[in-house]
Amino acid sequence: MTAAPMFPAPMPRVGIAAVDHYLDRGFDSVVGMSSHFAAAVCCNLLKIQTELGVKGPIAEIGTFEGRFFIAMAHALQPGEKALGIDLFDWPNPAVIDRFEANCAKHGIAAERRITWKTDSRTMKPEDVLAKLDGRAPRLFHIDGEHSRHALSRDLERATAVMPPDGLIVLDDMLHPGYPTLMVAVQAHLEKHPEIVPLCIIDRQTIVGATKFVLCHRDWFKRYEERMLKVFKDNIWPLGADFEPHWCLVLSLDTRLADIT
């Protein structure tokens, strides 16, 4: 008889001291909505990239006060920078000061980050590359305006600057408050068959919602092979069926329904 999986499954560790320290002791003190679980997964993905020889900066649309941004920045290698893109006007203009203060408090020095106060609706792919000195971001986290049109636009920009070994992470997928976002993702995948879902990061709470991770089809197996080992305790057995593409589901709840 097969033993039932542990519930909840263990929170993944990253194995990068600065990342694990921040996730354990600083993450929850920074105002934001992304989950500890999603941050641990994405920082592990950055570590996997490094092990595979993937180099470069990262970018994020919707940086807010920096909760997720700081975690990812700690997973970068020396000389790699993190670009934070936001209007920085909600809930008040002082949010940019709180972002800068949070970065400084939690160890992301000014020379390791780029703060870009701009409207992603007017941003062009070449503008992103110019901010990064011509280097394509190896991971692009999209947590901007939660409308179908805005996500479609942000996805096109991220895809335009995505290197062959790059990753795109999408926030608040399958969220009951934003049901049409999935429509934008499906349309984008149909338009860009070279891009496929790499994994689904299950929600930790309704606030710490589900994320999708996308990659180039040619890199899917290379990433998946590493992920099967790194996330062995967090793999939901049935996976996700994107018809016909299949990908991993990572979760803190890997149980199946008991129907016996």
What are these model-predicted stretches?
Residues 1-141, 145-169, 173-260:
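A short alpha-helical cap/connector motif
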